[in-house]
């Protein structure tokens, strides 16, 4: 018996009825869909979290840039996929949300971490808009969103090269496709004034070759040209390459679209070790190390003096 007629809102449609039969007989329905934002790291399977792998295996559909899905290898072999090209980010996220609205568990595959310069923010931006304002359908706005974190390029680069992120750092994308260069320039000045280690994402593209040189010149106003710079390319892949440079010697022609550029702070140091090179940024333990060393030296001198007395 119908108690309250159907009513609609922006978030739900409902009606209320009373039944004399319990439990209810099987009724046709559709399970709620889910969008899974999955960061797969830079590309190496061993760097993918178990949670990300489980989400991929449980997905009804994989959505993403075709290269990123290809990086999954055998893990994606038997799962339906919808490939998108670079530049189709909005279409990618919109499709994932609307597909999930039909009851599917849709995995949006992102390199690195889905919430760092990836699709996570765009998915939420679409959910934050009404359909009339360019958002998604009301059904798509009701899907569940789950996120599996991934290793971002700055983390992978730091791990491969030592501990350049040992103290305060920031990340700045040099792509001015969506962000005005004036805003990016302002952030570089702020990073320089704050003496942050800086990880530059999207340093160059085929058409964009001037921003990294400009960023280098800005940072040299705040720190010397001798601070270490790391060029980390194709991290976690067979063609991985690390190059150790200084800010003053940074050559833009050594950088490509797959490179993350890490610029050290004024305190960052470069080491040449027997097993290779490394860069690190001290956390601030020097005064403790100096104090302990002074105490050890004083104790050694005292023991030597006592030995002479006896």
Regions found by a protein language model. Give the residues of each.
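A contiguous loop/helix-start segment that scaffolds small-molecule binding in enzyme catalytic cores
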Residues: 1-37, 105-106, 193-298
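Class I S-adenosyl-L-methionine
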Residues: 15-26, 30-45, 50-145, 251, ...
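Short gly/ser/thr-rich secondary-structure transition/capping motifs
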Residues: 40-47, 179-181, 243-244
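Short gly/pro/ser/thr-enriched loop/turn and capping motifs at secondary-structure boundaries
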Residues: 69-71, 89-90, 116, 152-155, ...
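Class I SAM-dependent methyltransferase SAM-binding "motif I" and its flanking Rossmann-like core
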Residues: 118-194
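Conserved small/polar residues in nucleotide/adenosyl-binding loops
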Residues: 299-307
């Amino acid at each position: 018996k119908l108690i309250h007629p159907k009513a609609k809102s922006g978030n739900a449609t409902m009606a209320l009825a009373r039944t004399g039969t319990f439990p209810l007989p099987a009724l046709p329905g559709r399970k709620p869909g889910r969008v899974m934002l999955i960061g797969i790291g830079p590309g190496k399977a061993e760097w993918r979290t178990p949670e990300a792998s489980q989400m991929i295996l449980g997905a009804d559909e994989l959505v993403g840039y075709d290269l990123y899905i290809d990086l999954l290898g055998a893990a994606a072999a038997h799962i339906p996929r919808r490939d998108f090209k670079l530049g189709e980010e909005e279409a990618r996220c919109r499709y994932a949300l609307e597909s999930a609205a039909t009851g599917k568990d849709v995995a949006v595959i992102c390199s690195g971490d889905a919430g760092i310069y990836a699709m996570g923010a765009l998915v939420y931006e679409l959910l934050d808009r009404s359909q009339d304002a360019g958002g998604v359908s009301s059904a798509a706005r009701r899907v569940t969103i789950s996120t599996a974190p991934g290793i971002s390029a700055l983390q992978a680069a730091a791990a491969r090269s030592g501990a350049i992120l040992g103290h305060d750092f920031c990340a700045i994308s040099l792509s001015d496709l969506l962000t005005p260069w004036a805003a990016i320039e302002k952030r570089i000045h702020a990073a320089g004034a704050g003496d942050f280690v800086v990880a530059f994402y999207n340093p160059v593209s085929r058409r964009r070759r001037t921003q990294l040189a400009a960023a280098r010149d800005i940072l040299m106003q705040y720190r010397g040209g001798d601070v270490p710079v790391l060029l980390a390319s194709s991290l976690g892949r067979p063609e991985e390459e690390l190059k150790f440079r200084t800010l003053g010697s940074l050559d833009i022609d050594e950088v490509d679209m797959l490179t993350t550029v890490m610029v050290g702070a004024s305190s960052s140091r470069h080491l040449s070790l027997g097993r290779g090179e490394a860069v690190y940024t001290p956390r601030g333990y020097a005064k403790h190390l100096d104090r302990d060393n002074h105490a050890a030296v004083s104790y050694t001198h005292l023991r030597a003096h006592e030995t002479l007395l006896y």
